[in-house]
Amino acid sequence: MSNITPQEIKKEFLKSKMGIAGIVILTILILTSIITMIIIPIETFQEWNNPESWITYPKAAIPIWVNLFLTEKIPEHKILAEPNIETMFNDEINLTSYQFNVNFNYDQFPKDFIYSYLLEYSGSPLIQVSVIRPDGVKLELVSTSLPHSDLKTIHSDRMFSTDAMIKKELVLQEEKFEFEINELSVEDIVFSKTESNKPLKGNYVFLVDFYEINEESKIIDSKLIIGGKAFGIMGTDELRRDLAIGLLWGTPLALFIGLAVSIGSVVMGLVYGIYAGFKGKKTDETMMRFNDVLYALPALPFLIILSVTISNSIFVMTGFLMIFGWVGIAKVARSMSLQIKTRGYVEAATIMGQKDSKMILKHILPQLLPYAFASIAISVPAAITTEAGLSFLGLGDPSFPTWGQILHDANTFGAAARGLWWWIVPPGIMIAITGLAFVFIGNALDSIINPKLKR
């Protein structure tokens, strides 16, 4: 091992293009993690496996930017939660009207549409839903009364385009079309041209009228969902979850797992190896035989057994990875410790009666720190890929949206066979990029502290 100061390491590292590239990638990952934890609501993390939280999202939707490369535009999924509101209260009528403007410029019909509302009322309000199309044709969709209540009650409901009463209402307006509509779906009828069954592009206005709403009643929530086939910058999975959120939350989780395992393993191995090499004789022999036993154990089968029998918690898994990750570090640290303790200044300190702990901390440990930092950087990718592998096998913590867990879900629902590439490729790329950052940094440090590796 060469004697090299921290200043020299820094100077040489800044000359390394590989090291600089690794630092740039790592900085981007750290900034992504910080922004994710600050901006994205923590509820999206906590509710990742709660289907109710994602019910308004589309199922297995492609990313919206794919439309840039398609001649036939795919309809985007739209969640409209801020309608224009008009109210009218007089002796003749009490009306609250919600207007949802939908700009539809796609070459395919939407999958469906849903109107959901939450209403506090008394009496028996009447709800009428209609749509004014770009060609000026107005279609009545549904007219229904809510259950009568003398007391204030809170009522929530959803109206689906698949409801039979909506299809029945549209069939009664068949004269507005020049072709047969009986066999068509509701969304195909609503978004179709009058002369042919092709999408009608333009601005649609969905009107939701609440009649007999008194001044004491109030509409708490009103939302229109146009079910599209494209959503977000990363699309959605079969469980309707926004994959962009999963990928972003996976970044701090990957860094936590990788750094926690690598730092823990290196510290354990460093302390163990230095102490064994410094003490020597029977202590060294006993400690290294125990190290050999652990080194010979097949790590993956044991990790599988431990995760099944004890716990698949991400924190417990991190501990398991530390247990199997320090043995190789200990062997190298022990060999370095044996070399350093034979040097004159260490022998002089021994003759002067310095304590073992002081000699280790003052004379041996500082010389192993460059190796320790390089080992930490190089060990991170292994920890991340091991966690991803265990999660892919179904042995990870399902409550955390790690990249490995996303790949596991993709495999479970046959994403590869179904061509859902956006569910598979991005998490794989993120794992590769994160690993590459630490490999670049580790190799740059390794070439500095081991000059023989330089080319």
Question: Where in the sequence are the language-model features?
Answer:
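Gly/Trp-centered helix-boundary motif
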Residues: 1-258, 410-428, 432-433, 446-455
